[in-house]
């Protein structure tokens, strides 16, 4: 929503971050579970008809215990993601230059620099608003920092991720996969 254009025409715009906090965080958790369990691949195998045990065994997925969940952004949604994921026994890291460190501590999150989040995360969730400093925050250079076994999850805003760079990273095996519910253009 172009807030400035709305203001200039006398149109009120309301932002309700608590209204979507839990549903968006639940979506992130759903992506984590689906990606780690290779759910989409398993679905395709089932829909494709009978498959062998060997074919299915190649897509068993990975456990989450001890894996690192990283977040770029630790506001209402980011903190809720960590609250929901607490029972999964993962390591939590985040980058948010605007957050009070006591908030990070309250959800057992270690704050780190941006590049470390890309390097260390097994699952990286994006939880930032769209602005000039966040447009294409996830770009080719940062995607190449990620582990080839890592997954990117974006439920924030589409233009935060350079989609051309993401497609390249996925097709070249730079990262293992992605879960998106936002795209560019939105």
Predicted features by range, described:
Residues 1-13, 139:
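An N-terminal-biased, well-structured beta-alpha scaffold segment characteristic
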Residues 10-22, 96, 114-115, 156:
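Short beta->alpha connector loops at strand-helix junctions that form conserved
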Residues 14, 140, 149-186:
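Rossmann-like dinucleotide-binding domain for NAD(H)/NADP(H)
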Residues 17-68, 83-84:
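Phosphate-binding beta-alpha-beta segment of Rossmann-like dinucleotide-binding domains, i.e.
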Residues 22, 131-135, 159-160, 185-186:
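Short, small-residue-enriched loops and turns at beta-alpha junctions
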Residues 57-148:
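Rossmann-like dinucleotide/phosphate-binding beta-alpha-beta segment
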């Amino acid at each position: 929503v172009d807030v400035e254009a709305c203001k200039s025409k006398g149109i009120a715009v309301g932002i309700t971050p608590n209204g979507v906090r839990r549903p968006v965080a639940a979506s992130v958790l759903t992506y984590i579970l689906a990606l780690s369990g290779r759910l989409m691949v398993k679905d395709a195998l089932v829909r494709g008809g009978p498959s062998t045990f060997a074919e299915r065994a190649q897509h068993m997925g990975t456990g989450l215990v001890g894996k690192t969940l990283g977040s770029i952004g630790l506001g209402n949604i980011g903190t809720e993601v960590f609250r929901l994921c607490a029972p999964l026994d993962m390591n939590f890291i985040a980058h948010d230059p605007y957050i009070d460190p006591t908030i990070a501590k309250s959800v057992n999150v270690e704050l780190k620099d941006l590049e470390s989040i890309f390097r260390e995360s097994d699952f990286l969730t994006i939880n930032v608003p769209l602005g000039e400093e966040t447009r294409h925050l996830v770009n080719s250079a940062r995607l190449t920092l990620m582990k080839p076994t890592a997954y990117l999850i974006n439920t924030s805003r589409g233009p935060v991720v350079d989609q051309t760079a993401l497609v390249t990273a996925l097709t070249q095996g730079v990262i293992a996969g992605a879960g998106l519910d936002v795209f560019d253009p939105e």
